[in-house]
Amino acid sequence: DEIDKIKKINKSIVKENGTVESFDKQLIELIGGRYDTRFPMVVSKNSKCLNYITKNASNPILINVSTVIKIKEKHDIGYAFVSDCEQMIKNSIFAFDSLKHDTSKIIVLDEVDDEDNPIIAVVRLDKKMGRDAIQINEITSIYEKERLSNLIEKTYRENKCFYKNKTEHIRSIGFQLPQDVKYALSTEYSRTSFTKSQVEED
């Protein structure tokens, strides 16, 4: 069950009454130097926010402390933004397979940075963790992506899979897409996930 999994991952964030400390609270403890950094942080007890991408909704979502720090120091994305990542993933526009890592998905958030670059989250699915090989989904990065349309185009040409979520918000991130990708991501196209060959067949 959810709580048993969390206990095996990091028992210090499971309270006596069986509830799990919120991700927000974990971040506050990290800032205050009170978080035990040997353990990953638990963003969510389950993966319901990823249900348009994966059927394994029971996997908890984790993020390593080092990742949170890297996101802040390298990408200048603060804790307040990161603390909201579960909600942002839930409201993400669409996602697609990573070209680099078979098990990772690139999630396009409905968010932009100060220079209007889209912000993406990278999630590794079904990672096995620890002695008990607990299946988890891990957020491995969150950053602003310049030239995201180039990556989308390349990924599409490689026949990787795309997953649609709140694609009606696609205009809000305002980048240019090739016509066929634009069509496939639109509400006019009925598939909720697709590859280039499926779009061409249809």
Go through each PLM region and give its residues.
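Ribonuclease/tRNase effector modules and their secretory precursors
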Residues: 1-202
